[in-house]
Amino acid sequence: MASEIFGIAAVFWVLIPVGLAGGALLLKLQKD
């Protein structure tokens, strides 16, 4: 069960920065 929690945490650790970077990129593209 602990492995499942660590797996979910790892997914969030990856998705959150990627989502923020993707959102920033979209904003930059829309401004140009």
UniProtKB/Swiss-Prot annotation:
Per its UniProt record, what InterPro entries does this chain match? PetM_cyt_b6/f_cplx_su7
Instruction: Enumerate the subcellular locations listed in this protein's record, separating them with semicolons.
Output: Cellular thylakoid membrane
Tell me the Gene Ontology biological-process terms attached to this UniProt entry: photosynthesis
Molecular function GO labels: electron transfer activity
Gene Ontology cellular-component terms for this entry are: cytochrome b6f complex; plasma membrane-derived thylakoid membrane
- Membrane-crossing residues? 9-27
Ordered alphabetically, the record's keywords are: Electron transport, Membrane, Photosynthesis, Thylakoid, Transmembrane, Transmembrane helix, Transport
Q: Does the keyword Transmembrane helix apply?
A: yes
**Major localization listed first in the record, in broad terms:** membrane
In its keyword annotation, does this UniProt entry include Phosphoprotein?
Answer: no
Question: What membrane topology does this protein have?
Answer: Single-pass membrane protein
Assembly and interaction partners: The 4 large subunits of the cytochrome b6-f complex are cytochrome b6, subunit IV (17 kDa polypeptide, PetD), cytochrome f and the Rieske protein, while the 4 small subunits are PetG, PetL, PetM and PetN. The complex functions as a dimer.
Q: What does this protein do?
A: Component of the cytochrome b6-f complex, which mediates electron transfer between photosystem II (PSII) and photosystem I (PSI), cyclic electron flow around PSI, and state transitions.
* NCBIfam families registered for this protein in UniProt: PRK11876.1-2 (NF008826)
* Family to which this protein belongs: Belongs to the PetM family.
Name the UniProt record assigns to this protein: Cytochrome b6-f complex subunit 7
This protein's encoding gene: petM
